């Protein structure tokens, strides 16, 4: 426990918070061939691998994921939300932050309905989250 005098002299150091989606904080300068700080809400990338993985206990499923090389040359694992997808290797995707709690190492989501990713078909509720257009009628 510090004394009042010690607090007056030094003060308290504020905690620095770690980013939940660190890959979104960097850009790439191709002239300098170096990473630069360039925070962005989303980033574009190319899928290098598409597959399924099993979640942690007590859940059981085959969750779809894609390994994505971003425009800043960082490679991340991103979750593909919704039922069914059209992604394959070399698909251009847009990712956002947001982890998947039962998949270790997955800290990003792919945005459906943007770039090469199609929206979820036959979706009626919560359409905006899955890139689905309003149905006719």
Swiss-Prot record:
One of its GO terms (biological process) is translation. Residues 1-23 are annotated as: Disordered. Keywords: Methylation, Ribonucleoprotein, Ribosomal protein, RNA-binding, rRNA-binding, tRNA-binding. Pfam families: Ribosom_S12_S23. InterPro entries: NA-bd_OB-fold, Ribosomal_uS12, Ribosomal_uS12_bac. The keyword Hydrolase does not apply. GO terms for cellular component: small ribosomal subunit. The keyword Transcription regulation does not apply. GO terms for molecular function: rRNA binding; structural constituent of ribosome; tRNA binding. The modification 3-methylthioaspartic acid is found at residue 102. With S4 and S5 plays an important role in translational accuracy. Part of the 30S ribosomal subunit. Contacts proteins S8 and S17. May interact with IF1 in the 30S initiation complex. This is Small ribosomal subunit protein uS12. It comes from Levilactobacillus brevis (strain ATCC 367 / BCRC 12310 / CIP 105137 / JCM 1170 / LMG 11437 / NCIMB 947 / NCTC 947) (Lactobacillus brevis).
């Amino acid at each position: 426990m510090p004394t009042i005098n010690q607090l007056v002299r030094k003060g308290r150091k504020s905690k620095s918070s770690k980013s939940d989606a660190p890959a979104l904080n960097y850009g790439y300068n191709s002239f300098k061939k170096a990473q630069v700080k360039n925070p962005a809400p989303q980033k574009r990338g190319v899928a290098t691998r598409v597959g399924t993985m099993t979640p942690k206990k007590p859940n059981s499923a085959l969750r779809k994921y894609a390994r994505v090389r971003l425009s800043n040359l960082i490679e991340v694992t991103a979750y593909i939300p919704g039922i069914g997808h059209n992604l394959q290797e070399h698909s251009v995707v847009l990712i956002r932050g947001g982890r998947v709690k039962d998949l270790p190492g997955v800290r990003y989501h792919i945005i459906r309905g943007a770039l090469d990713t199609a929206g979820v078909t036959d979706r009626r509720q919560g359409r905006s989250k899955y890139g689905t257009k309003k149905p006719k009628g």
